[in-house]
């Protein structure tokens, strides 16, 4: 009897834990298995483990501990990149079918970058960076990011920048 009750609860948990924003899940489903595409998903437990054991200062550690999931999709193949525009392809799906609001838009020549987010008065719960044009990428961050923590991190690390892979 316990198994009959446990199985539906387990499936419900799995389906809700895998849920992501419209546009994000579509992009990953379409591109993650294609050659020339880098797809990275980092779960919260791995991020918190890195925060605990990494050689980080207090602000870096606190920032990492506030992140529950990171998903990155980048098109690196030149031919596929020339035929694709992630911004054009998924902008409408995110804008129309999501709770996310546009936080910032940058257009420079052929490149388009839009940052979407879901926030309350205390934190940013979800952040989506959508890049299309000459370069195509999508970065999705879910967690409880405090704006003052991001600001402090950027002030203390101006050479690195936020969400930068520079050393």
Task: Outline where the language-model segments fall.
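Positively charged n-region of N-terminal signal peptides that target proteins for export
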Residues: 1-4
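Early exported N-terminus immediately downstream of N-terminal targeting peptides
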Residues: 24-90
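Short Gly/Thr-rich strand-loop-strand
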Residues: 93-119, 163-167
């Amino acid at each position: 009897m316990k198994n009959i009750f446990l199985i539906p609860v387990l499936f419900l948990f799995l389906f809700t834990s895998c849920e992501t924003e419209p546009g994000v899940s579509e992009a990953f489903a379409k591109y993650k298995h294609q050659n020339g595409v880098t797809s990275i998903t980092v779960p919260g437990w791995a991020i918190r483990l890195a925060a605990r054991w990494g050689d980080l200062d207090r602000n870096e550690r606190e920032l990492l501990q506030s992140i529950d999931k990171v998903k990155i999709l980048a098109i690196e193949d030149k031919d596929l990149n020339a035929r694709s525009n992630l911004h054009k392809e998924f902008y409408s799906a995110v804008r129309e079918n999501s709770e996310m609001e546009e936080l910032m838009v940058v257009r420079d020549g052929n490149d388009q970058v839009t940052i979407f987010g879901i926030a309350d008065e205390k934190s940013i719960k979800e952040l989506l960076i959508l890049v299309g044009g000459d370069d195509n990428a999508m970065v999705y961050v879910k967690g409880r990011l405090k704006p003052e923590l991001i600001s402090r991190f950027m002030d203390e690390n101006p050479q690195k920048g936020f969400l930068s892979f520079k050393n």
